[in-house]
Amino acid sequence: MFSKATLFFTTVSRYRDTQAPIPTGQTNQPTTNQCNTGPVQCCDTTQSASDPINIPGMGLVHVSNANGLVAFGNCSPLVSGGSKCNNQAVCCNGTEFNGLVNVGCTNVSL
């Protein structure tokens, strides 16, 4: 025969497992993802990786080991069903300068 404590804990654990998750304030909106490396990014500026980049506050910088395009200036993931990208949508495979510059980018048509 079960003790009262065992019955109590069994009931509480079953009740807890059936409750809805508590909202945390974070939204889990799906991102538009046409890339193998992460979400499609909407960036203010893109240019050839072989050209020096003028980053405000840093001056001209050169990106090493990058092919294709580099993207910089307020890059953010696109959200499905959300706002459209008014600048350039890109798919990138890495970052440099502590995330200020996305490297190895290709244009994405939406």
Swiss-Prot record:
Pfam families assigned to the protein according to its UniProt record, in alphabetical order: Hydrophobin (PF01185)
Cysteines joined through disulfide linkages: 35-91, 42-85, 43-75, 92-105
Cellular localisation: Secreted; Secreted, Cell wall
Signal peptide (UniProt feature, chain positions): 1-27
Keywords assigned by UniProt, alphabetized: Cell wall, Disulfide bond, Secreted, Signal
Matching InterPro entries: Hydrophobin (IPR001338)
MF terms (GO), sorted A to Z: structural constituent of cell wall
Free-text biotechnology note from the record: With its ability to stabilize oil droplets, exhibits a better emulsifying activity than the typical food emulsifiers Tween 20 and sodium caseinate and can be used for the food industry.
Domain of life: Eukaryota
Coiled coil ranges: none
GO cellular component: extracellular region; fungal-type cell wall
Subunit-structure text: Self-assembles to form functional amyloid fibrils called rodlets. Self-assembly into fibrillar rodlets occurs spontaneously at hydrophobic:hydrophilic interfaces and the rodlets further associate laterally to form amphipathic monolayers.
Family note: Belongs to the fungal hydrophobin family.
Function (record text): Aerial growth, conidiation, and dispersal of filamentous fungi in the environment rely upon a capability of their secreting small amphipathic proteins called hydrophobins (HPBs) with low sequence identity. Class I can self-assemble into an outermost layer of rodlet bundles on aerial cell surfaces, conferring cellular hydrophobicity that supports fungal growth, development and dispersal; whereas Class II form highly ordered films at water-air interfaces through intermolecular interactions but contribute nothing to the rodlet structure.
Name of the protein in its database record: Class I hydrophobin Po.HYD
Organism: Pleurotus ostreatus
Recorded name of the encoding gene: Po.HYD
